[in-house]
Amino acid sequence: MENLSVNLADYQHGAGFDGAAMGQANLTADQLAELSKALEAGQLQGGDMSGNQTNGGALKTESLESSLKLITFKESDIRFWKRFPKTAAFNTVEEYNQLTSYGSDRGGFNNEGELPEEEDSKYVRKAEHVKYLGVTKSVTHQMQLVNTNVGDIVRRETTNGILWILRKADRALFTGDEKVVKQEWNGLYAQHMNNDQFANLDEYMDSELVIDLRGSVLKQENLEKGAQTLLNKFAQANLLIAPPVVLSDFATEFYAKQRVMIGGSQNANTKGMTTGQHISKFQSMYGLIDFEYDIFAAKAPGKLSVAPASSSKAPSAPTAVSADVVANDGHSKFADGIGDYYYAVSAINRYGESAMTQVGNTVTIANADDSVDLTFTATAGAYTPNAYVVYRSLKDPSTPFNKTTMYPIMVVPAAGTDTKRGSLANGVDGAAAGKVRDRNRWLPGTEEALLLQGDTDVIEFKQLAPLMKMPLAKLSPADRFMVLLYGTPIVYAPSKMIRFVNIGRNF
C-alpha cells in the first residue's frame, strides 16, 4: 500500500503541524489561531497583482509544471500528408500528359500480305495550379528575454506555425477546391470529380468510381468491389484512407464474429486477455490494401445555428428566401429519406465562414421523387462570398431549429458554369438560376473515404519550394516571420481511385 499518496510528512517545514509541535512555540492557542488565519495560503494564484491580498498568498511561489501540455493535435496526427508522394515543382502551373488510349479496341487480324488498319493513340495534357499556404507569427523582444517553460519561444512558435500549415495542407488534400475558393488547390475529391469522362453530376455519382453506401458502414464486400473496379481500370488498390470513425466501425463489424475460448489448461492466459480488433490491412482477391486513418479526412462536424462566424473577415450571413418541395423529380434519392427536415445556409470566402441562416421552416418530403429547391441571396457586406455551405438536419428532428444540430451536406460556388458543381448564379443539380436543389445525394452526418493505388503513377504533391520560414522586417521590438508552403496535389489518374460516399455509423 505504499506510494498511493503524499502525506503531511512530505510538507514539513520545521516543527510540523501536530498539537505537540505547536505547543513548543511561545504562543497561546488564540494567538496560534490568529497566526494561522493571517498566513493562510488561500487558493489565489501567486501571480495575483491586485495588491489586496490579506493572507499568505502573496508569499507563495507558483508551482508550474515544467513541460508544456498539448491539448490539440500533434505531428503524428497528420498522417496522409506524410504518406503522400512528393516531388519538386518548377513552375506555378504544373502540367502533365496522360496517355488515355492505345487506340480503339477493334478487330486486328488481317489476311496474308494485307496492310493493317491504322490506329491513333490518344494523349491529353492537363494542369494544376500551384497554390500558396502561409501564416505569420510574431514574438516580442520582451517575451524572448523572460524565462518560460517551453525553451526557445521563437523556435516554439516556428513549430506551432509549421503544424498550423500542415493541418491546413493535410485537410486540403481531401477537400480543397479552387472552384469554391479560388486560392485553394484542388484536393483529391475535387480532381476525382473533375474527371473529363463525366459530363454532369448524375454521370459522376452513378459511375462505378463512386460507391454510395447510403448511411451504411463500410464493409469487406465494399472494399472487394472497389478493388475489382480498380483492377478493371488497370490499377492495383493498395491504400484505403479514411476518417478514424470509418475504420473503427469497420473493425466493430468483426466483434460478433469473434470466438474466444475461456477455460481449460490450453487457455490459462485468458484471465488477462485483450479484446477488440485492430485491422491494419485488408486482403482483397487482388492484393493487400493498407488501412490509414486521418482525423483531418473527417467532414466538418455538425453545429447549432447560433454558432458564430469563424472569422471577422467572413462574409455576412446569406439572406434566405424560401425552401420549396419539387415534385416528380426523376433524379431524387429521397426514397430512403421521406420525412421532415430543417435547412440552413452559410457563406464562405478564403478567410472563413459566416453564421448560418435558416432557409424556410420545416420542409416535409412526402414522396420518393420529391426534392427541395433552396432560394437565398448574398447579403451586402465588406467581404464578398465565394461559395455557400448548405446545412440539413437529420430526418424528423425532435427539437426546434435553434436547438437542432445542422450538418453540412454540400458546398455551392457563388458563380461559375461547372456542370457537376453548378453555382448559385446558374443553378445547382437541375435547379433554376438562383436556386440550389437537394436531391438527397449527400446525407447529413456521414463520412467519405478513398480507395486508390497510392503511388506516383496516380497521386503526387508538386512542391515549388521546401516548407520554409521567412523573416519579416522589424517594425517594432518583435521578431515577425512567415511560415510558407507552395505546392499542389495532382491526381494523374482519377479513374484509378474509388470514392466511398455517405458512409454511416455503427452506433
Task: Label each PLM-derived region with a short phrase.
Residues 303-444:
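Disordered, low-complexity "stalk" and linker segments at domain junctions of extracellular
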Residues 1-311, 316-319, 340, 365-372, ...:
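Flexible, glycine/threonine- and acidic-rich loop/arm segments that mediate assembly and lattice contacts
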